[in-house]
């Protein structure tokens, strides 16, 4: 039987973040010409679109100020790098619609290469006094994931609720990719498996405290982004339920809080081949416990990118 070990006070802070392109020209909102709908692109002038392998299209959003009547805008391609992109020549709004989607296809794009697309809007419903951009530059890439072999994940989140050993290593197969702003690692959730064996360095091939009834069928992937700020675990479902609903977790900073001093990001040590999430860096939640409240974790979590890195960490303890 599993017993709840700690219950922290509930912590939920909504994060609202906005970003802008400091190099892009800004428009000053003025009075639109009579009858002009003020159609423009939503978002920044320069946008980055990164998709997973197998995805060969993406959507851009157009918006407008006047929505009473239907409207149409012309789309002109200014730059189509290597003729990768297929774009519609017009985008239409139905009466009452505030936004519309422009779907761009890139059927021949190769993985790991960034392609640039520049578009411009024109027509009677485009105004110099609208609030957004009439032109847009999009850098599009299909991520290229490469295996870097077996690593070891030591979890400090589940022990926030239950009396389990946070130093148990779980063997995970790690993939790596490089994005426009980060180095990214991913691996299948070890919690969605029952451990049946250990490898030569002691890593379990699943979570050793699981029974078959604890597993929630599905695909669950841990994704860690490393930027100049630090390492961040994207919100993830574990694929495990110990009677209080699905476990989930992620980084506190950027998801629940903007206070990086109280809730630090993880530390990527490239030389040591490790990522350390210190105390209060990650949160954990169970869907049916306290309305799914998210709790910062007092125990650290570690990802070692190789067996050598994990064994070296044992020698330095």
State each model region's role.
Residues 1-8:
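Bacterial N-terminal signal peptides that target proteins for export
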Residues 143-317:
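Ser/Thr/Gly/Pro-rich, low-complexity flexible regions
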Residues 4, 21-159, 312-317:
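Acidic/polar, low-complexity intrinsically disordered N-terminal segments immediately downstream
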